[in-house]
Amino acid sequence: LPTSANQEDHVSMATYGARRLADMVNNAAVVVGVEAMAAAQGMEFDRSLKSSPLIEAQFAAIRQRVAFLEQDRYLAPDIDAMREWALQADWPAPLRACQPSHA
């Protein structure tokens, strides 16, 4: 990023970039959390159907954090709980293998 007409540009943008990356990670976690919450809500509509043990385990983890949505309610606490769920570090190995970074 030029700051002085391309002369003596010694300004590192790493700190700013890292702060932006932290915001992007949080925003992505909100999106993933909301998508998972919607998927869990959809699964509840017909619980006679079962999924894989891996999906069922994550479904149970989601339901520990967020109850079934029976009627309108303020969703900010649920969204925050799901953001924390999405940021967890202990994902099962098959899910970690699907991540681009294999984190």
Give the label of every model feature segment.
Residues 1-103:
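C-terminal auxiliary extensions adjacent to catalytic cores
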